[in-house]
Amino acid sequence: VDFVHVSGTTEEKHFPTANGSGVAVLDYDGDGRMDLYFASNGYILPDAPGLGRNRLYRNLGDGRFEDVTDASGLGFAGFCHGIVVGDVDNDGDPDVFLCNYGPNAFYRNEGDGTFTDATGSAGLGDPGWSSGGAFLDADDDGDLDLYVANYGSWSYPQDDQFCGDREADLRFYCSPREVRTVPHLFYRNEGDGTFTECAAEIGLGRDPSHQGHGFGVVAADLNDDGRIDLYVANDMNANFLFLNDGDGTFTDATEASGAAYDDMGNDQSGMGVDAEDVDGDGLPELFVTNFAGEYNTLYQNLGRGFFFDQTPSFGLAADSVPWVGWGCGLVDLDNDGWPDAFVSNGHVDDNRPGSEHAEPPLLHHNVPVDDSPGAGRRFRLATRDVGPYFASPHVGRGVAFGDLDDDGALDIVVNHKDGPPAILLNQTPAASQNGWIRLALVGTRSNRDGIGARVEVEAGGRAIRRQRKGGTSMLSAHDPRMIVGLGPAREAEAVVVRWPSGAVSELVGVPSGSTIEVIEPEGDPDA
């Protein structure tokens, strides 16, 4: 993999060049191996060197990747921040949406290893400044809709102001507060290859409070009512929580949720985001990465759409205060059945006195508070024990997770600003010693990707709950297959998949190491 990210950063510090780009883990050609797609930015001024180019690499299955950008048609040349992946036409092939500074782009997968630019015909080419997004089936009609987080409105030279130290002739990136916010977008999939923007119509853009410097988006059932909700990390604005009403509309629960601000009522610099059950009560917590001087926030799920900032008690606050956090994940990296926390760090400024541009990443293992039965959970910093990458600083941005070598352990891919990426193969001894199963969900009545499905696994006396989510992290997309760690158990005694349609799939006695394609029953669940 010879990709090198280009941000377009110059001494003028044009704001869009600060945020970097993401990466996607996807099986673009249907051969069962996870491929890699990297996004790049570019220079903004007309006389500058030009725009970056996205690159697609095919997994050859022997630890090597082949650049297939030209042959695939995915060589987008533009200022790309985020990658959103989903099968929007339910044909079994992942399609790709790109969030850009400038017109967004949509590529339809033709099923033969090539993509067609279908931006215009699909109606997805909004000309603003988008950063991230998520596919989800908001109205449960069986196809994927699309939420797009817009960062704001910024253009050169109108918005190119000096921020920094004039006496020292040092120019820094301006605060996000200097960037005008704009409404975010929601596209309803019409089922015929076209989309209709309808954010205001369905409750996602009815008033100015629905504007924010949007970054990461996660689509998941956050209040345990069987409907897929939306949570959006905003940079120096309140984070949004929209609860699904079940009729294709949403209720804004931002202010009442407890997940909009930190525990002191301050908005933070929300960037990366994930949702996962870290304490074993069956409800997904929310995790948001933030700027230096703040901390990465863990909101404990109290049920019924209410959350509380419990970051210090979970052990995630102090370690994150010095760093600028970006892409992230609550992912089980040792297959013990408990999600760990990974964060990619890196400052925006490369010339600020007293501040380093490159910063070390963070990895926290999810561990019991003590040895007593039924003890609660907390996180323990583990970066000293997990490899040389964690011992050195990097200018990290987007992060994606996936099993690149099909050994049952989640690997990590980081897109670095103005540098080559990191591909971190998971060689954690516990990941191979613990049990695991891998589920590939195939919807029939529900969307084919199974986004919105809830999975319950019984193994070794534990009940493990996971969801097939949309979005997560920042600017990036993950392996669509679900790996569930079983800990010391050698089989999953029971696996239950609850589909968005209401259908239920049940499996019993699934041995560790199994990869199971779970196809949704086609009958009417209410019949």
Ranges and model annotations:
Residues 20-30, 58, 80-90, 94, ...:
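Beta-propeller blade termini
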Residues 1, 66-70, 116-120, 196-201, ...:
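Beta-propeller fold detector
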Residues 68-85, 98-138, 148-177, 181-183, ...:
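Asp-box/WD-like beta-propeller blade repeats and closely related beta-sheet repeat scaffolds
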Residues 33-40, 91-100, 146-150, 229-234, ...:
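Hydrophobic beta-strand segments that make up the repeating blades of beta-propeller
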Residues 2-22, 50, 72-84, 123-134, ...:
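Repeat-based blade/solenoid architectures
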Residues 39-51, 151-179, 343-358:
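Short, conserved, GDST-rich strand-edge loop motifs in beta-rich repeat architectures
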Residues 8-10, 315-318, 349-352, 356-370, ...:
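Gly/Ser/Thr/Pro-enriched helix-cap/hinge segments flanking short amphipathic alpha-helices
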Residues 54-59, 182-189, 243, 300, ...:
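Beta-propeller blade signature
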